[in-house]
Amino acid sequence: MNMALISLAIDYKKSPIEVRSEFALSGLDVSMLYRSILAIDNVVHAVILSTCNRTEVYLEISNLRVVDDILVWWQGYVRNPNYKIKDYFKLRQGTEVIMHLMKLACGLESMVLGEPQILGQVKDSYTLSKKNHAIGKELDRVFQKVFATAKRVRSETRIGYCPVSVAFSAITLAKRQLDNISSKNVLIIGAGQTGELLFRHVTALAPKQIMLANRTIEKAQKITSVFRNASAHYLSELPQLIKKADIIIAAVNVLEYIVTCKYVGDKPRVFIDISIPQALDPKLGELEQNVYYCVDDINAVIEDNKDKRKYESSKAQKIIVKSLEEYLEKEKAIISNSAIKELFQKADGLVDLSLEKSLAKIRNGKDAEEIIKRFAYEIKKKVLHYPVVGMKEASKQGRSDCLVCMKRMFGLNVEK
């Protein structure tokens, strides 16, 4: 069966967050999703990726006309009928799918260029597909090459070390100041958009504990509810929370400092304030044991890293192009070897049947020389039957290129 590789995607480049939310497949029963998409005729294998910035479905299909059926399937999960998937989705095919997936896993397609979290999300999607028996050999080879490429990009470039967003830069600064973050407690003050983004970046680092403090605890609880080592708190609990914390990051709207020197003892801490107006007293940084960063410090890091990240991005692109070439060459070899194996099996089948008949006749006393001549004639006819039919058909259609190719295959003179 001839397979085609395609992907259908809705992402932040074309769709605002309210649209992405409507078409998101996260939060649904994963097994049910895979059962339903694999039940569509001509869908053979699938991997579903759904994050806050994109939802993408990677597929092996046996007929390109199935795209309309897949769109109908996806539309069925949309709550608001005013949103039509045909207005937002992007279709990729063949090599374009592999190139996109490589760039995606390396962070080159992310809203924050080079951010590392997407690779983990792609790996999780791949694992879920395997768990649901939804991935085939070709798609599996694609993802394995993608992961190897992402690993190479991370090891041979510094694209993940050059943060260009305030939240991501803040987390990067915290990582630089503290070794073994898995043993540290992190306090995030504020559960707004930036605070939530901070929280998600921190969870990817797997610290010992994450505490999220907010004026209204309901919002903090909503953000922390799905994470085992996370807890939600009122702002009034700050004095107790600060005592536990090794890293304190503030992203909250206040009119005066809510953390001052009176809250801290001799324990070394990293304070990062991305609030405007400032929420953490700058005098915290004057204490010898503390490290203090404000928005201006972070913006300086961002500006300094923009050019670096562009340079690292170009290096990553070259690695991806080379990796794609390697993958395609290997696939050609796999296809070629498969075709050669099938050709020999076909020949064996033709020879074995005729040979058995010929040997039986010889054993029954028939003229061996005559039988061997007949055997050779029959094999010649059988082996050349399909090539001759193909050459005649190519000639009828004016496909001189096919004729030349077949002549070369059989060692004939291509000039005639």
Swiss-Prot record:
NADP found in the keyword field: yes
Site note Important for activity, residues: 100
Sites where the protein binds substrate: 51-54, 110, 115-117, 121
GO biological process: protoporphyrinogen IX biosynthetic process from glutamate
CDD domains reported for this sequence: NAD_bind_Glutamyl_tRNA_reduct
EC number(s) on file: 1.2.1.70
Residues that bind NADP(+): 190-195
Residues the record marks as active site: 52
Reactions mediated catalytically: (S)-4-amino-5-oxopentanoate + tRNA(Glu) + NADP(+) = L-glutamyl-tRNA(Glu) + NADPH + H(+)
Additional observations: During catalysis, the active site Cys acts as a nucleophile attacking the alpha-carbonyl group of tRNA-bound glutamate with the formation of a thioester intermediate between enzyme and glutamate, and the concomitant release of tRNA(Glu). The thioester intermediate is finally reduced by direct hydride transfer from NADPH, to form the product GSA.
UniProt remark on domains: Possesses an unusual extended V-shaped dimeric structure with each monomer consisting of three distinct domains arranged along a curved 'spinal' alpha-helix. The N-terminal catalytic domain specifically recognizes the glutamate moiety of the substrate. The second domain is the NADPH-binding domain, and the third C-terminal domain is responsible for dimerization.
Cited function: Catalyzes the NADPH-dependent reduction of glutamyl-tRNA(Glu) to glutamate 1-semialdehyde (GSA).
Quaternary organization: Homodimer.
The protein's name: Glutamyl-tRNA reductase
Source organism (scientific name): Francisella tularensis subsp. holarctica (strain OSU18)
